[in-house]
């Protein structure tokens, strides 16, 4: 195998690549830096995107309704991501992305959000319709156009708004599990 070390690369903390580096011991010979901020460029302006709970509430560009809608959506995605990770750990597959206990220092989403029931409306709402685009999926969750762009491009790291919602949602789960995985810094590792 060959790894190109000539240029910085983006590797999310909950990604399998980082887990492989840590398990193999190769991480001792590499340097990692957490992403401090994520930006979306639109209308000639680069705008910082709230990527964790404290950023959402500090953002003066979001209305109260937008903050509630975004937090409700991100909590639901986090809860589902944690359920998925727990299922992988119990099945013997990789579950290392859950190494920060929910509610512990370094967990950005608190403790109660993970413990949802099957009747939880937010969890049910995360079902992706066959062929649904990410933009339609986020619209169904009540996110405004600016929030849809921020979630799609900055958090799910997609390049098009009409990307498949199922793929983008899986990428968003990895991003959310990466936030503060290795400490309370802002952003994904």
Pin down the residues of each PLM region:
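Rossmann-like flavin
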Residues: 5-7, 18-187
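Switch I (G2) and immediately adjacent beta-strands of P-loop GTPase domains
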Residues: 1
């Amino acid at each position: 195998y060959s790894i190109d070390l000539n240029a910085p690369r983006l590797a999310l903390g909950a990604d399998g690549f980082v887990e492989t580096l840590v398990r193999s011991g190769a991480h001792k010979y590499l340097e990692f830096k957490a992403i401090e901020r994520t930006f979306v460029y639109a209308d000639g302006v680069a705008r910082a995107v709230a990527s964790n709970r404290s950023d959402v509430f500090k953002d003066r560009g979001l209305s109260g309704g937008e903050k509630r809608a975004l937090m409700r959506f991100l909590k639901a995605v986090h809860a589902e991501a944690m359920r998925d990770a727990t299922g992988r750990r119990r099945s013997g597959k990789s579950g290392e992305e859950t190494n920060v206990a929910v509610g512990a220092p370094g967990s950005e989403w608190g403790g109660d959000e993970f413990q949802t029931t099957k009747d939880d409306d937010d969890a049910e709402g995360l079902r992706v319709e066959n062929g649904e685009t990410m933009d339609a999926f986020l619209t169904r969750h009540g996110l405004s156009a600016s929030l849809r762009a921020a979630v799609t491009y900055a958090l799910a790291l997609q390049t098009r708004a009409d990307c498949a919602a199922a793929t983008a949602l899986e990428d968003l789960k990895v991003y959310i599990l990466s936030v503060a995985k290795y400490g309370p810094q802002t952003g994904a590792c």
